[in-house]
Regions:
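Conserved phosphate-binding catalytic cores of ATP/NTP-utilizing and phosphoryl-transfer enzymes
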Residues: 1, 100-121, 287-288
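Short beta-strand scaffold segments in enzyme catalytic cores
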Residues: 13-19, 122, 130-134
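Glycine-rich phosphate-binding loop plus the immediately following alpha-helix
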Residues: 105, 137-178, 200-208
Length: 319
């Protein structure tokens, strides 16, 4: 069986082609990039997706799919609708079933596929999501998460204020290599974190301190918080595998800090490769393969859910 996956939750329109053995046959994407100092405009991101969708889909269709999966949420509603509509259009064209998948779960499952881990804790870090997750009682349970904004949104918000191009993460990581530490608010509550205090503090410091110092301090403080709550979750769940996934998983410093923590615990660690860490269609396709029993040709029932949480999904498969 071959599944075409369509990702369109935020700035990226991506398509992937994956078979039932987990072989990734194609993975193509194009990203909407707002001007420096600006965030994602949902209407402009939607138009970007409409403009590139057929080209990106055609590049991935090196073989005829047996089914189509699309990211139904969480995400920006205008962007989600583009992916859903294209999934329905191509499913009708090929007369094949369609299945909605949860964007967050797709990040987790592509991580498990690549890591070949059986029962990991997962640190999922992206623009809108920052969660510490493990599988318990037929669902992925969120043991810790941000109480305000995602770590990726924090990086991009700071980047906008500092006039750093979107997405800001890679340039912040590079600037941080030359920085020195400045104390910032450190907010951990059990296994939850908050980033809004750090954001406010950093924005007030722009222009008063070297940008390299601000980038370094942002990373060191926020990543230490994430590693602390992740280690706490691993101890609580008594698990000895950790997967770092999501767009921010591409950050080498965060991966290094996670690896050090795992080594000290005698645990295994896997950083999802950069081409699969961020938003892309291959993860949607693989999640479609896993949830193939839910696929249907009732195209008019295809829905989106912009607030669809990780822990609301019943896991009907064994990955």
């Amino acid at each position: 069986m071959i599944c075409l996956g369509i990702e369109s939750t935020a700035h990226t329109f991506g398509t992937g082609l994956v078979d039932s053995k987990g072989n990734i046959l194609a993975n193509v994407k194009d990203m909407y990039r707002p001007p420096a100092g600006w965030g994602i405009d949902p209407s402009k991101a939607k138009q970007h997706h409409i403009d590139v969708a057929d080209k990106i889909i055609s590049e991935a269709l090196i073989e005829k799919p047996d089914m189509i999966a699309y990211a139904a949420g969480p995400g920006l509603p205008p962007c989600l609708k583009v992916g859903r509509d294209k999934a329905v259009e191509y499913a009708k064209k090929f007369n094949i079933p369609i299945v909605p998948v949860n964007h967050c779960i797709a990040h987790l499952e592509i991580g498990k596929l690549l890591a070949k881990f059986k029962d990991p804790v997962m640190l999922y870090v992206s623009g809108g999501n920052t969660q510490v997750i493990a599988f318990e009682a037929e669902r992925y349970r969120v043991f810790g998460e941000t109480e305000d904004i995602g770590i990726g949104n924090l990086l991009d918000a700071f980047g906008r204020a500092a006039k750093i191009d979107f997405p800001a993460g890679p340039e912040i990581e590079e600037l941080a290599k030359k920085g020195k530490y400045i104390e910032l608010p450190y907010s951990v509550k059990g296994m939850d974190v908050t980033f809004s205090g750090i954001k406010t503090k950093l924005e007030k410091m722009i222009g008063k301190f070297p940008i390299e110092d601000l980038c370094y301090s942002l990373q060191e403080t926020c990543f230490a918080m994430l590693v602390e709550v992740t280690e706490r979750a691993m101890a609580h769940c008594q698990k000895n595998e950790l997967i770092l996934t999501g767009g921010v998983a591409a950050n080498k410093r965060l991966a290094e800090m996670c690896a050090i923590m795992c080594k000290e615990r005698g645990a295994k660690f896997f950083q999802v490769p950069i081409q699969y860490a961020g938003d892309q269609g291959a993860m949607i396709a693989w999640n479609g393969i896993l949830s193939k029993e839910l696929a249907t040709k009732k195209y008019d029932k295809s829905e989106i859910n912009s607030k669809w949480r990780t822990d609301e999904v019943d896991i009907t498969w064994k990955s």
